[in-house]
Design a protein with these regions (language model features):
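FAD-dependent oxidoreductase catalytic-site/capping-region signature
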Residues: 234-335
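Short coil-to-beta-strand
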Residues: 74-81, 253-262, 354
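A conserved FAD-binding loop/helix module that cradles the flavin
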Residues: 361-384
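Hydrophobic, well-ordered secondary-structure elements that form the walls
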Residues: 153, 183, 260, 289, ...
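A conserved beta-strand/loop element that lines the FAD pocket in flavoprotein oxidoreductases
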Residues: 110-124
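A glycine-rich dinucleotide-binding beta-alpha-beta segment and adjacent secondary-structure elements
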Residues: 55-71, 228-236, 295-366
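Active-site/ligand-binding neighborhood in enzyme catalytic cores
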Residues: 3-114, 322-326, 331, 339
Length: 385
């Protein structure tokens, strides 16, 4: 079912927007259409999958970074699921050799080769669009300056764009719902199940306490204002897939990286006491991870020069403070369907704003959502006409 949808939908992401009816006809499978585009995903999964753990693993693609139940009527979980399963037309995920730094470096090199001037340590203060283009006010070490352009492509969240335009914020602010951990390990931990080697277990996505019932309990606890007692989380060991992300000395020492992504950690849980809530969420998440290990993960964490554990933890509020992603929402806002929801949007690129000279090129665009690069390409196509 998902492969049918992926094969039909993925190629359209880099084309002008189709209407809902056109995309439905393109998919050509009414059962698949209803399951993902019309019925709450939880209902579909419950009907098709009898095992609680298997159902939960499927649902994580719908709930990661999205604070919702599997049966939410607004279908935000369905939209999140859709973008996770259509990648490459197959749903397969890939990581760049050399890590995201290699991607950034390649983008920089291409931009400079094309004659671009890149400014760092620079804060954009405001945008002033008019019928001839747009002005951009910014500050750097030399004070406040401004430039004009025929088109301005904005990689910030839509809510941040509204602020830069001097417009009133929307009533419904985005809210992120994740806890992100990055750990540097001296080695991978042993599992409770001794028949599975750590290298095999951590080579893909490692799901921890993510059964369907566990996901629902965690949501209910978070919705009631409490950090989940046993947070659902999943891990990715990117250094197993691509050892080049570590330096030669760390590779020789057998070190590994471990990224842990915790679900159902909405920004509201951190508002009253950001530091205390972050510490509590970290402790709860490590306990959750330890529950499937034969040894505490803390014993495998490397230490810095002053003995501090090599653990980076970021709550939604940390993400907002450091990157100005409103509410710490990893998708900049709730994901949108990959089709035009109004007739006048058909044929657009999904990057347009109320100002012709200003386009979105980041995750908050229609068909956005993160590191795909699709919004940037579509914004470029909109400029090229």
């Amino acid at each position: 079912m998902t492969r049918t949808i992926a094969a039909a939908v993925f190629p359209t992401l880099t084309e002008p927007l189709r209407s809902r009816a056109q995309l439905r006809a393109l998919i050509g499978d009414e059962e698949a259409w209803r399951a993902v585009f019309e019925d709450p995903l939880g209902h579909t999964v419950s009907a098709m999958v009898g095992d609680d753990v298997a159902a939960g693993v499927i649902l994580t693609d719908a709930l990661i970074g999205t604070f919702a139940t599997a049966g939410a009527s607004d279908l935000r979980q369905n939209r999140c699921f859709l973008y996770h399963v259509i990648g490459g037309g197959t749903g397969d995920w890939h990581v760049p050799v050399g890590g995201m730094g290699a991607v950034s470096g390649a983008l920089e090199a291409a931009a400079r080769a094309a004659g671009a001037e890149l400014l760092t340590s620079t804060e954009v203060l405001g945008l002033e669009p008019d019928e001839r283009g747009a002005g951009v006010r910014f500050s750097d070490g030399d004070g406040e300056r401004s430039v004009r352009a025929g088109r301005v492509l904005v990689n910030a969240a839509p809510a941040e764009l509204q602020r830069l335009l001097g417009a009133a914020p929307d009533a419904s602010a985005p809210e992120g719902a994740q806890l992100k951990l990055n750990l540097l390990l001296s080695r991978l931990p042993r599992l409770n199940d001794a028949s599975v080697s750590p290298e095999r277990a951590f080579a893909g996505t490692f799901h921890v306490n993510e059964g369907a019932e566990q996901l629902q309990v965690a949501y209910e606890q978070a919705a009631a204002g409490a950090i989940p007692a046993l947070p659902p989380c999943e891990t990715y060991c990117h250094s197993l897939t691509d050892p080049s992300i570590l330096g030669p000395e760390l590779r020789a020492a057998g070190a590994e990286t471990l990224t842990v992504f915790g679900l159902h950690m909405p920004a509201r849980l951190f508002a009253a006491d950001p530091d205390g809530a972050r510490a509590a969420a970290l402790a709860a998440t490590l306990r959750s991870l330890d529950s499937v290990l034969a040894e505490p993960i803390a014993g495998c964490v490397m230490r810095g020069p002053e003995g501090e554990p090599c653990i980076e933890v970021r709550s939604p509020l940390d993400i907002e403070a450091e990157l100005r992603m409103p509410g710490g929402h990893i998708f900049h806002r709730d994901l949108a369907w990959p089709f035009a929801e109004h007739e006048e949007q058909v044929g657009n690129w999904g990057v347009e704003t109320d100002h012709p000279a200003v386009l979105l090129c980041g995750a908050g665009a229609r068909r956005g959502g993160g590191v795909s690069g699709v919004p940037g390409r579509n914004a470029a196509m909109a400029v090229l006409g």
